[in-house]
């Protein structure tokens, strides 16, 4: 199947570290994978290509809600929690779980975005945007991921 930019709900520019919603005229800064760009399993890289939002997680979650394995922990992120768990990869507020649409590139054996658990998700607001720092996911500020969550199908 072939896709066009006109069909896209979300456009991510990894070189510019931006996410656009053309249909809503919205623009956000992001942080992608610190290991660079790529589709390989266990690479820590952010995948390229056509994707869809497979699952939206956290519909009614409070801002700064903490998720582990896509489940709310009951915790609300704050500095004390950050100091208690300094090595935790914080997934906050909302999760958009991505699924690749290109067999052999970002879907299937060894490269599957969905099976790699690649999300668009909230991160602590103290984390910088425009600098690749994630483990492969797309990180956003919490107010912005909450807004995005409400705008995409």
Spans of model-derived segments:
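N-terminal post-signal-peptidase region of extra-cytosolic proteins
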Residues: 1-9, 29-43, 75-82
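Short linear motifs in intrinsically disordered
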Residues: 2-13, 147-151
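Extracytoplasmic
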Residues: 5-7, 14-16, 25, 48, ...
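Soluble periplasmic/extracytoplasmic beta-strand elements of cell-envelope proteins
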Residues: 9-11, 29, 52, 95-97, ...
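Glycine-rich catalytic cores of cysteine/serine-nucleophile enzymes that process amide/ester linkages
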Residues: 14, 22-51, 57
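"…centered on the first transmembrane helix and the immediately adjacent amphipathic helix/loop
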Residues: 56-57, 62
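Exported/periplasmic cell-wall-interacting domains
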Residues: 63-153
């Amino acid at each position: 199947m072939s896709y066009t930019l006109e069909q896209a709900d979300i456009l991510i520019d990894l070189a510019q570290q931006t996410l656009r919603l053309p249909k809503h005229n919205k623009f956000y800064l992001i942080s992608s994978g610190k290991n660079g760009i790529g589709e390989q399993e266990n690479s820590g890289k952010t995948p390229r290509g056509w994707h869809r939002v497979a699952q939206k997680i956290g519909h009614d979650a409070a801002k700064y809600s903490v998720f582990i394995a896509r489940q709310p922990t009951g915790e609300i992120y704050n500095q004390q929690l950050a100091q208690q768990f300094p090595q935790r990869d914080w997934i906050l507020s909302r999760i958009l779980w991505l699924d690749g649409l290109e067999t052999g590139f970002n879907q299937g054996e060894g490269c599957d975005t969905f099976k790699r658990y690649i999300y668009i998700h909230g991160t602590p607001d103290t984390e910088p945007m425009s600098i690749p720092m994630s483990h492969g996911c797309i990180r956003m500020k919490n107010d912005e991921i909450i807004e995005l969550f409400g705008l995409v199908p």
